[in-house]
Amino acid sequence: MGKIISLANELLALLFNGEYVIQPFIINESEFRIPCLGSGYLNDDISSMSSSQIGMISMILSFSLLYNSSTKYNIIKLDEIDGPLDYNNRVYFADVLNRIMSIMGTEQCIMISHNSELQLDNADIILLKHDANNPDYNRGNIIWSY
């Protein structure tokens, strides 16, 4: 469990500049909690944090579990992973995703999203609903649109 928490905190530092630190999990017969230190305050469980913070921390914990599994993955698929994130965290997450993938040793990421705010300048984009007048949909390398 220590390796997972350690990597999760390393990845969280990329996203939140060290503002949040996951503490050892509380696991017993009657409870499962993930305490998190944030802004000098100890949250007894991440469930008491904002939905955007929960989304980011849950995603980071998932990456940490994946990294510490016995199977290594060159390609990951992220389906609506940015859904619970607010605008600022969504934009920031897209910026940090390449660094997370580098740490994990992942070469490619297939990301499914309904949000146009992502900074995808370095991505190949497949659009299923293209609005030529919307500048948010005209960034990156559009390789196919409908």
What is each model feature region?
Residues S51-K77, V96:
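GG-anchored amphipathic helix commonly corresponding to the ABC/SMC/Rad50 NBD signature/C-loop
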Residues Y41-D45:
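Interfacial catalytic loop of ABC nucleotide-binding domains
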Residues M1-P24:
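Charged, surface-exposed helical/loop "interaction arms" that form contiguous linear patches used
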Residues L15, M49-S51, L66-T71, R99-G105, ...:
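Conserved catalytic network of the ASCE P-loop NTPase/AAA+ motor domain
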Residues Y73-I81, L85-N89:
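Walker B catalytic motif
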Residues V91-Y146:
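C-terminal lobe/lid and adjacent interdomain/linker elements of RecA-like ASCE P-loop ATPase modules
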Residues P24, C36-G40, S51, L61, ...:
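Flexible glycine-/small-residue-rich
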Residues N17-L37, K77:
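Long, charged, glycine-rich C-terminal linkers/tails
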